[in-house]
Amino acid sequence: MKKFSILVCLSCLCTSFSYAQVIDCDDPTSSSLKKICSDQFKDIRQKLDTQSMTAFLISDAPQRLLVDTHQLWLNRLQQCKSLACYQQQMDFRIDDLNFYTSLNQSLTQHYLKFEHGTIAKQPVHLQVHQLSKDKIKIEGNAYRSPNNRIETQTISFLAYTTPDQKQNITDNENNCHYQFNFQKAILSVKSESKACNRFVGVYRVYD
């Protein structure tokens, strides 16, 4: 029984390690991966691997969230057209992993926008934080091109509400009004304003 438990633990560690490897440089298949796998980025790749492994081992964030946000980030990284962009995106991912590792995720629900069963091509990540018994904070980002200036790479979302007023939400960043429909596995977001449609859609919950 003891040997079996050890084997199970080792299996879990190996699975986590395979997911935690940020970039596979054994056989880079694209020109962008070849740039990322160059010696110039060796130190930050190692830092990313370490931080990713730490997140998988000790974060209370759902592992599926770590996997899917990694893929989302990797897709964005491969859109980069400059070395500065690569560096910037890797720094951003380290910050994200630090967030998942250092903060209590048990009071936060994460949502990624999905289209046709996969993560949306124009990704959106919403987070619903239970700040207290009577206060909820909803924040998020709609991602744009990583080649934009830093201040235009994302569209921010920020709202505060209460548990009994979670359906009608006003985004303080853009003064947009939304109807949030929280269900067991998904979140549906609607708006009557076409100017606010960037956050409209169906989201998968990670818990």
Q: What name fits each language-model region?
A:
Residues 4-14:
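Sec-dependent N-terminal signal peptides
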Residues 15-20:
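Sec/Tat signal peptide C-region and signal peptidase I cleavage site
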Residues 24-26, 32-66:
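Amphipathic, heptad-repeat alpha-helical segments
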Residues 56, 62-101, 165-175:
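Mid-chain, structured segments of secreted extracytoplasmic proteins
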Residues 75-77, 142-184:
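Contiguous, well-ordered beta-strand patches that form the walls/edges
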Residues 102-125, 203-206:
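Tryptophan-anchored aromatic micro-motifs
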Residues 121-157:
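N-terminal glycine/threonine-rich, aromatic-flanked beta-hairpin/loop signature
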Residues 150-164, 191-207:
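Edge beta-strand at a domain terminus
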